[in-house]
Design a protein with these regions (language model features):
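Short hydrophobic beta-strand element within catalytic cores of glycosyltransferases
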Residues: 302-306
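Membrane-proximal helix-turn-helix segments that form the acceptor-binding/catalytic region
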Residues: 109, 134-151
Length: 387
């Protein structure tokens, strides 16, 4: 692989409003720029962008105003601007909104190389959520966009299989998300209070299984006085669609006193939450590859997660405990796992080792660069292109 490439990255939000996708988009873009490539990023203006702008270390950052409903991300100036740019490769993150349509226009007009990262949006559960809107978008532009892509990037084998099942007949590259590894002490810091903390940190949305988690927590604390007295369930994250109030009501109806709703956490507050928790939980129904799990491992925390989180390496490495969404089954897992401090500590160490081995951003960016070089005619087909 030789020579600098002219790369474009297209996404919706350029700020923390993107949730886990923010770092998943920004980190490789910044690193590719640092490695000498020309990286231009195109996205949507939102209220949180001013605080995030300086963290983008790319050649060009272009933000565009939205007209109409925010969820559609209709920014016509993006499409007009993008269509005139002669990039070697364009990497689109996300589907079902105007940036996807703008990327499709670029691909059609420039005859370029389009890479699409759905980030789990083509998984069966995700396709069934808001199905009517997605069928309309598919008919209007998205189906043709997917079929015209040079490559669709999957985060894991399960996502690749879900994409392949759609019959798009497009090469699929498996490139996982990465994580920034913090410096952590070999000996954990002294506890600030007597209770241990089980942390959920992510988007507040039904697919995350938070209602089931609260129900299971209520069952578990009734059955286990030790869990009730020794553990706190902390639910942190931004509310995507006014789903938080019913969850707070549910916790009150169940009489839970060892539960805390912390709201969205960013920067140092997020780092403190990860560093200070004793275990991390993600009872999701559908994921691409959750950044939050990788971040928990980076902080040497044991993880409780469902198979839908799509990181089977965690189970194989002893870094994660398999859980289910069913409240009774999940309650049993909570009582069992959280009563084994040494096992939890071992899992946390295994998680950190797994993150160091497989999920550093340098490693993941190597794969991005190899894929783009192949598509630009400057390198061989990578072995992680599986279809």
């Amino acid at each position: 692989m030789s020579g600098a490439m002219n790369l474009a990255v297209v996404t919706a939000s350029l700020s923390r409003e993107a949730g886990g996708m923010f770092e998943a988009v920004q980190a490789p873009a910044n690193l590719l720029q640092q490695r000498g490539h020309s990286v231009s990023v195109y996205g949507i203006e939102d209220a949180a962008l001013p605080a995030a702008r300086l963290s983008w270390q790319v050649g060009t950052l272009r933000s565009f105003a939205v007209k109409g409903p925010a969820r559609l991300a209709f920014a016509p100036d993006m499409g007009t601007t993008l269509a005139s740019e002669p990039h070697d490769v364009l990497h689109l993150h996300g589907l079902w909104n105007y940036p996807s349509y703008a990327a499709s226009r670029w691909n059609h007009k420039r005859s370029g190389k389009l890479v699409i990262s759905p980030h789990g949006m083509l998984d069966p559960w995700a396709l069934g959520n808001g199905a009517l809107k997605k069928r309309v978008a598919g008919w209007l532009y998205e189906n043709a966009n997917l079929r015209s892509a040079a490559t669709i990037r999957a985060l894991c084998k399960a996502e690749a299989e879900a994409i392949d099942a759609l019959g798009l007949k497009v090469p699929i590259a498996i490139i996982p998300n990465g994580v920034t590894l913090p410096e952590i002490a070999e000996t954990p810091a002294a506890r600030c209070n007597s209770r241990r903390t089980l942390l959920f940190l992510g988007r507040i949305h039904p697919k995350k299984g938070i209602a089931e988690l609260i129900e299971s927590w209520a069952i578990a604390v009734r059955q286990s006085p030790a869990l009730r007295d020794d553990w706190l369930l902390r639910i942190a994250g931004w509310d995507d669609g006014d789903h938080l109030p019913p969850l707070v009501t549910l916790a009150g109806e169940r009489g839970l006193t060892n539960i805390d709703f912390s709201g969205p956490l960013y920067g140092e507050a997020k780092e403190a939450a990860l560093a200070g928790c004793d275990a991390f939980i993600l009872p999701s129904r559908s994921e691409g590859m959750p950044m939050s799990v990788l971040e928990a491992w980076a902080y040497r925390k044991p993880v409780l997660m469902t198979d839908a989180c799509n990181i089977p390496e965690g189970f194989a490495a002893g870094a994660a405990f398999r859980i289910e969404n069913d409240p009774a089954a999940l309650a049993a897992s909570l009582i069992d796992v959280l009563d084994r401090p040494e096992t939890l500590a071992d899992a946390g160490r295994s998680g950190r080792a797994l993150a160091e081995k497989s999920f550093t951003w340098d490693r993941i960016t190597d794969q991005h660069a190899a894929l783009f070089a192949w598509l630009a005619g400057r390198g061989d087909r990578p072995d992680f292109v599986v279809q």
